Amino acid sequence: MSDKAGSRATMRGWAIRAYGEEMVLMNELPIPTPGPHDILMQMRSAEVGDWDELVRAGEWDMERPFPLVLGLAGAGRIAAVGAAVTDFSENQEVYAYSYPLHDNGAWAEFMLVPQSHVAPIPASLTPVEAGGVPIVGLTAHETLIDVLRVTRGEVVLINAAAGGVGHIAVQIASGLGAHVVAAASRRNHDFVAGLGAAAVIDYDATGDVAKAIRAQYPGGVDKALNCVSGKAANDYVAALADGGKMVDLPGAVSVQRAGVQIISDYVVRGNGARLAELTRRFDSGALRLVVHEIFRFDEAPRALDLVLARHVRGKVVIRTT
């Protein structure tokens, strides 16, 4: 283990003592020790998303002991590697997503992850920016390519298109040759159009969003990625074409409709190989990350509050070091 971690036994981290409790900054959490196939990351930054609130509230049980450090993904410098790790070495800048948590979470000075969940960060991003990629990047990439199997010429609807998952999904879908219909607030129309959306629907001004979509696409959309919660999610089901398919990330859709397929509560797992593919896409210029705001480590609760207010363009990141 490097001197940076080896000279210390404890670290700081934002943790909860039980599900449903408020997070607190703890100063003497144990620094994890890598097993044979593990990587210990000294964190540069951590991703923030509404999933962090699901973990805090106990809706996503991590099956880990308390105190539980929050945060599922981020970027950092490799502080130590397990004896069986051959593809990575100390001091490499990497990023990772760990769900369910392998050990502790990312909102700490160090995070322990399996080597299979790790990839080098894009050279086109700073280590702090890179911490905003893993969850939203993996989610957009996996749902569009593996689950929805988006192909050239298909009409693909992406709502909350200016958000974390949404703004990456618009770029991936348009890069696949799809005709992207993005749903976003008026202030974000130029933003999502600049990412590759062929059409933008103003969900704030539209009383019936499905009707507005079908006014432009009478046959409906072929595929849809739903990123919104609440009753609003149901409105998008009517926009699907017969035989259409939707991935409903939050599991918010409660209506049924014959002739369409809805895959609910879809959650990606850690995948270093797919993260490496995202790295290649960022470095080729096919993808760009928009960071809404970077918070200091001691401002983690404020960062989560901002995300939950749902007025974020792109990603919110915590700078951990």
Predicted features and spans:
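C-terminal hydrophobic helical "lid"/dimerization subdomain
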Residues: 1-9, 275-321
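Short amphipathic alpha-helix with an adjacent loop that forms part of the alpha/beta core around
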Residues: 207-219
